Amino acid sequence: MAEDRDWQRLDKWLWCAHFMKTRSDCARLVEEGLVRINRQPTDKPHARLRPGDVLTLPLRGEVRVLRVLAMARRRGPAPEAQALYQEVEEAPGADGLRLA
């Protein structure tokens, strides 16, 4: 089912972008307060994510900062998932973020 909205649930976007194997794992990461949207902590998997937002999240022992480029239509292959975001070089405001 294609979504024509200008936003997408945070947990679904993380899952479609291949950051976790299951959507439940994505929701758990968010619920633990480990994710920030535009430097603001969130613990709500249903938070609205839009193109241009900046995500800060801990993955595999490091803090990653990503700019959202597009909303996901489905959980597709890796090249399709990688086109959803762009790595941001600096990690501003990531100082207080706990690593999972």
Question: Where would I find each of the regions flagged by the language model?
Answer:
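Glycine-centered, phosphate/nucleic-acid-interacting loop/turn motifs that mediate DNA/RNA or nucleotide
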Residues: G33
